[in-house]
């Protein structure tokens, strides 16, 4: 648990600790993955596992942890009979996240954007542009430029080496 708490914003550590002590689940911190921030799965032996990317952004880490804990709660209550990001998950996610939704834990603009996001949360926080931009302010500096900041006609490349040109809308 200490490893998990080391990634959490300090004002949220006690709440997270209490939540995790009441939750029979294994949590593993992984190196950064390109396709997801976290993952929940039921293992063959019947136990549950959450994997979370190690990230220097404590707010992204906390949001991802709460997102995956909502999957765990839904799996406990409904087994595998519901959609992964359906109404049951959205309700569970709101219930878990709301106690953390205050400016002592999430600074503005994250707090206000996250409150709006919770009205109808997406399967991934990366699908909410305003939330992505609010969280980005707490990521380490990057030499990468987001595509939306490029001018029409500019070239850009992906990590796999593929090169593209930004076109006009």
Range-by-range predicted roles:
Residues 2-6, 10-42, 49, 79-169:
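Metalloprotease/metallohydrolase-associated module, dominated by Zn2+-dependent proteases
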Residues 35-43, 60-63, 67:
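Membrane-targeting and insertion segments and their boundary/processing signals
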Residues 46-65, 79-84:
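Short pre-active-site segment immediately N-terminal to the catalytic Zn-binding motif
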Residues 64, 68-76:
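Catalytic glutamate of the conserved HExxH
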